[in-house]
């Protein structure tokens, strides 16, 4: 049963094959290298953590857990543990963009984040890029194991100004690589 984050709790039937396929899709669509350091800003019980418990295990990664989701703890964990990846809703990214400058100081550039859970405003994507984060927009549903489509960034976007890149990255994407294999 789901946590009911967007309404009343509901029952959803998953199968191991679907979860494994979506975990592999996470690796392929987000280009996750070996030994990632993954920061848990979303609950593992919600949609099975978007299948990232298995995704990170498949890449021999490290899981960094938080006791509280707030800007201070997130930035501290990124700096202390060398976080390379995390997933979060736009509201969490908004916390980071609007955090005091002293919390943001020393955060390494290139930390990769998935943004999902609600349509992300281009301003949040732009704000995170200005902080040095590399966000990828995905969309999913509890019924499809979490992420199901991804806004695939195009190389030519690198030549655009930051505002235009953010606008394009906020758009809906294409189906995850292996979503068709999950359909039964």
Residue ranges with predicted function:
Residues 1, 8, 31-37, 178:
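Conserved pre-ATP/AMP-binding loop-to-beta segment of ANL
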Residues 1-21:
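Conserved AMP-binding A3 loop
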Residues 10-13, 40, 62-68, 136:
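Short beta-strand->loop structural element characteristic of the AMP-binding/adenylate-forming
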Residues 20-37, 45-84, 99-100:
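Conserved AMP-binding/adenylation subdomain of ANL enzymes
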Residues 42-46, 140:
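AMP-binding (ANL) adenylation modules
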Residues 58, 83-88, 97-170, 174-183:
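Gly/Ser/Thr-rich phosphate-binding loop
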Residues 70, 91-93, 120:
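Alpha-helix capping/helix-boundary segments
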